[in-house]
Swiss-Prot record:
Pathway assigned to this chain's UniProt record: Pyrimidine metabolism; UMP biosynthesis via de novo pathway; (S)-dihydroorotate from bicarbonate: step 2/3
Keywords: Pyrimidine biosynthesis, Transferase
GO MF, one annotated term: aspartate carbamoyltransferase activity
Gene3D superfamilies: Aspartate/ornithine carbamoyltransferase
Database matches in Pfam families: OTCace, OTCace_N
EC number(s) from the headed UniProt entry: 2.1.3.2
EC top class, as a word: transferase
Protein name according to UniProt: Aspartate carbamoyltransferase catalytic subunit
Family of this protein: Belongs to the aspartate/ornithine carbamoyltransferase superfamily. ATCase family.
Organism: Lactobacillus leichmannii
A single Gene Ontology CC term: cytosol
UniProt-annotated binding residues for L-aspartate: K100, R188, R242
Catalyzed reaction equations: carbamoyl phosphate + L-aspartate = N-carbamoyl-L-aspartate + phosphate + H(+)
Length: 336
């Protein structure tokens, strides 16, 4: 059975087993086809609409291992886990044996030995997950894994909640004009979103300081626009990115010296003038946290075209669907 929501997007109201995603792990949007994304969004909408949560046949223990700071993602995953009936075991990196030199594989091996079957991990190293999902010869770790962000690599749960927010608004992706603005080089959100939006048929544009734009990497996914004012009136979605000062080290250190908050806001920030230039049905998004007065003028964060709070709300249900996909993929708790 299907129904139509207030914004005319067709959503599922019944538990359709044939459309459920099943994955051994969820680490990158590169795992997903366009159909996979739509099925995941349908499932997330099912949960958002109050759909019945599948009953587990036995307790499933999980843990959230965040080696980088997080408010939205960490809390959202824990809410999602508890809604699904999982037993959440606390993990604090600052009080773990990681500080004694234990590597991530051995930390996960410890968790698996204690009966934990699912880990949600955020880690500063790009593609940290490879040592967990592709054990070396002689290693036997079995662990369900959801990637909550790896360095500047991937952020699949943020990408999926962004897709849900866009889909709820427009009912499709094909031909939508979406501009991603800001610290592109250092953004895992930009990478995940440009890949999946390309798969879904959207027209992607990029803007931001040229020292944060790598044409070799980004140009195959969209068009770089130097002056965002040239495109703003045509956009369906304006997606702002946080300036990630904590990643401006090493080879990126020189960009921190070039950066000026006032200049950035003048060139790329969402102010009242640019807000008024947007179409009436355009929406503004941001993965958070927001640097108010830099990427987004503070008095516009909750303006009518903003979907910032909606994104965060959708995140719980998307993460429920992602976790369920891994539970089913690994046949945990009687789910298949």
């Amino acid at each position: 059975m299907t129904t139509v929501s207030q914004n005319q997007v067709v959503v599922e109201t019944e538990d359709k087993q044939d459309n459920l995603l099943r994955l051994p792990y969820f680490v990158s949007v590169e795992q997903l086809s366009a159909d996979d994304v739509l099925h995941l969004l349908q499932r997330a909408q099912y949960f958002k609409n109050g759909g019945e949560v599948p009953a587990l046949s036995r307790p499933i223990f999980c843990t959230n291992m965040f080696f980088e700071n997080s408010t939205r993602t960490h809390t959202s995953f824990e809410v999602a886990e508890r809604r699904l009936g999982l037993t959440v075991i606390p993990f604090d990196p600052s009080h773990s044996s990681v500080n004694k030199g234990e590597n991530l594989y051995d930390t996960e091996l410890t968790m698996a030995s204690l009966g934990i079957e699912l880990s949600v991990i955020r880690h500063p190293e790009n593609a940290y997950y490879n040592e967990i999902i592709r054990p070396k010869e002689g290693q036997h770790l079995q662990m369900g894994l959801v990637n909550a962000g790896d360095g500047s690599g991937q952020h699949p749960s943020q990408s999926m909640l962004d897709m849900m927010t866009i889909y709820n608004e427009f009912g499709h992706f094909d031909g939508l004009k979406i501009m991603i603005v800001g610290d592109l080089t250092n953004s895992r959100v930009a990478r995940s979103n440009m890949e999946i939006l390309n798969t879904l048929g959207a027209e992607v544009y990029f803007s931001g300081p040229e020292y944060w734009y790598n044409a070799e990497e980004f140009s195959k996914y969209g068009t770089y626009v130097k002056n965002i004012d040239d495109e703003i009136p045509e956009l369906d979605v304006l997606m702002l990115l946080r300036v990630q000062h904590e990643r401006h080290n090493g080879a990126e250190a020189k960009t921190e010296q070039l950066f000026d908050a006032k200049d950035y806001n003048a060139a790329y920030g969402l102010n009242q003038r640019r807000y008024d230039m947007l179409k009436d049905d355009a929406i503004i998004m941001h993965p958070g946290p927001i640097n108010r007065g830099v990427e987004w003028d503070g008095d516009l964060v909750e303006a009518p075209k903003s979907r910032y709070a909606v994104q965060m709300h959708n995140g719980v249900f998307v993460r429920m669907a992602m976790i369920e996909a891994v539970l089913r993929g690994r046949k945990l708790g009687g789910l298949e």
